[in-house]
């Protein structure tokens, strides 16, 4: 029976507090005020560098409930927001229509998605190096240009799974770029992030989260948030 590594869980995620609020490192809304995240989408920072099996219950059951209660409390204290003429909504509508209007000369969604998967598997698999991760990052950033011309064959606006797959691919490229940038920045091995060019853990320089934020022009900025150590002190595993 052939056996190979596969993706089980994506560590990291949208930074939240314990109540699901998508706050920045200073504990204030940044980006979309009132945005909450829950479950395995969110990163509350409870798992360290490698989440163990079944510990997803902490994300889904405990913090899922806390996020729901937090969102309910926020909604009860804040008035309804009218998005009908919101610039953000209009921008999203234009993005959807732009994908539908693309000429049939670009890549199919499945082709571009496979190219992304191959590049990420090669450069950001189980064992990583600076060179390999940079090659993957360059490839993903090149795919962004190809994505602008990606072909959506179904031009309908109802139950259009081809359009959904195209939109998902855009989000995957965002995540792939973030994974590559974060991996290159973390010049150590920690948890499931294993670098052959930096094989040891570096608590002095990397006991921190690397937070990435995408700006309106597509630029990615980095922030850092220190790890809060309470009862259990970090030690070398022997």
Annotate each language-model stretch with its function:
Residues 1-10:
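Active-site Gly/Thr loop motif
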């Amino acid at each position: 029976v052939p056996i190979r590594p596969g993706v089980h869980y994506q560590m990291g995620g949208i930074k939240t507090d314990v109540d699901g609020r998508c706050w920045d490192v200073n504990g204030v809304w940044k980006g979309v005020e009132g945005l909450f995240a829950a479950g395995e989408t969110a990163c509350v920072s409870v798992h360290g560098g490698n989440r163990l099996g079944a510990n997803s219950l902490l994300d889904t059951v405990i913090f899922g409930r806390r996020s729901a209660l937090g969102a309910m409390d926020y909604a009860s204290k804040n008035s309804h927001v009218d998005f009908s003429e919101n610039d953000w909504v209009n921008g999203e509508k234009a993005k959807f229509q732009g994908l539908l209007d693309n000429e049939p000369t670009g890549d199919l969604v499945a082709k571009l998605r496979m190219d992304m998967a191959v590049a990420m598997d090669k450069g950001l698999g189980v064992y990583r190096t600076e060179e390999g991760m940079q090659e993957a990052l360059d490839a993903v950033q090149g795919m962004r240009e190809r994505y602008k011309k990606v072909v959506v064959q179904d031009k309908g606006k109802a139950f259009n799974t081809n359009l959904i797959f195209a939109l998902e691919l855009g989000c995957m490229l965002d995540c792939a770029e973030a994974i590559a940038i974060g991996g290159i920045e973390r010049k150590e091995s920690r948890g499931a992030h294993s670098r052959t060019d930096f094989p040891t853990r570096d608590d002095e320089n990397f006991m921190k989260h690397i937070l990435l934020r995408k700006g309106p022009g597509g630029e990615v900025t980095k922030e850092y948030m220190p790890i809060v150590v309470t009862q259990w002190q970090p030690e070398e595993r022997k």
